[in-house]
Amino acid sequence: MGSVYVNFFEEYPDTSYIKIPNNPLDRVIGQDEAVRIASVAARQRRHLLLVGPPGVGKSMIAQALSFYIGRPNEEIRVVHNPQYPERPFVEIKTREEVMLEREEESSTSGTLIDPKDAPTSVAERLGYRCSKCGFYSSPTEMVCPNCNSPKAQIGTQGPFGDVFNVIGAAFGVQNNVDKVTLTRRNGDHDEIVVYERYNDKIRVLDEKTLERRRRLEKKSPSKTIVPIDRNPFVLATGASETELLGDVRHDPYGGHPQLGTLPYERVIAGAVHEAHEGVLFIDEITHLGNLQRYILTAMQEKVFPITGRNPQSAGASVRVDKVPADFILVAACNINDLPYILSPLRSRIVGNGYEILMKTTMKDTEENRMKYLQFIAQEINMDGKIPHMTMDAAQLIIEEGRKRAKLIDRKNNELTLRLRELGGLIRAAGDIAVFKGNKLIDKEDVEEAIKLYVPVEEKIMKEYGSMAAAYSSETTGSQRDSTYNYANMDDRSYE
């Protein structure tokens, strides 16, 4: 054991002193080659196929990849097609265009003023001011809290307006209005000004603001399905066809212009579209089955249509063509699942990316033990509910990693990289420390967790002696004697 390693353990009392890297890829333990290729793939926008057992860092590499590709620069919208509503258009807006639109929309919001700063007649007609006593209150209060008179302006509804106001107030009906239009002098000409109710304030819209609003209203109605401010990392593990490829929601009114919802408003983007300009991560990709074909099509064309997936739905007749789907695919699988990956899909990955075999162990060196300490600190910080670990306890975690490398991978003088299970062991030790009220996870906590954190098969063998004995203890005599019991079956049972 090297002297620097010993000095390090003597210098720092616990893992709270371990520095965690800011670079997400540097937090991946023991997968140096995979990290190097992933950093290149992020810069060059290459696909990745990560092959290896669970818990060796495939998900961490995929998530870290999204930090290197930059923020998206395009927003995807579907626009209403008046001539053929079932075929909405696709509209792509750059970040600059989206920001400009937001500025225009904010400029149409007008100016908010206090009701007391508005003209008296406006405040009364909008329901803020009592026309009798001049008291100001919320427009939702129909009766003045000061004089108990109806607040709506008397005379605004004809000669019987005061009668209607009293009756309306008695039955909880508001007689004031939401908007008042006036003219005011602006230099050498008159301009129209609109006053609107806005909670406890009044919104003032001048002529320029109204003109901007009219320009915005002339634009074709649209719906944003992939916003500009989105997470570039999209997880699609175990996704259904609808989640992966998008859909069009059902409308019980069949998209009727007056009663129903227009088709463009019912379009839903899939994961392949949400990952546009980002990373689409699919763990256990072979579980997608035939859906791999659609992933391949999206990778080839960099666009994929959205259509209704349910033939019985009103959305089945709606289709949006050429929806952008330009993503980096990071797929992951176990070694024994490789034959079940669609051959053209794998060829596409190899043709524009890399296949990486993840390591399961690393050399038991001083540097790698330091990486184990970093891993322990990362797991504790990530959990957020357990204390840090003493160095004596951390030595036991390292020793456990050494044992697992020998037991599972049959490697001597190596440390396991199947770190997910070790992370569970660290959390179990942390829970024990919390239960005891310890400020740090000590050696005894880890030893207790190691005894507790064993596979259930081991516990069954220790308790019952064999799996058959354990099964037998859970079945009745009639179940054991049944010819349909799997223990009583042989090959002739199927003839």
From Swiss-Prot:
Membrane-crossing residue ranges in chain numbering: none
GO MF entries: ATP binding; ATP hydrolysis activity; serine-type peptidase activity
Keyword Hydrolase tagged: yes
Cited InterPro entries: AAA+_ATPase, CbbQ/NirQ/NorQ/GpvN, Mg_chelatse_chII-like_cat_dom, P-loop_NTPase, Sigma_54_int
Tagged with keyword Protease: yes
Record keywords, A-Z: ATP-binding, Hydrolase, Nucleotide-binding, Protease, Serine protease
Name under which the protein is recorded: Putative lon protease homolog
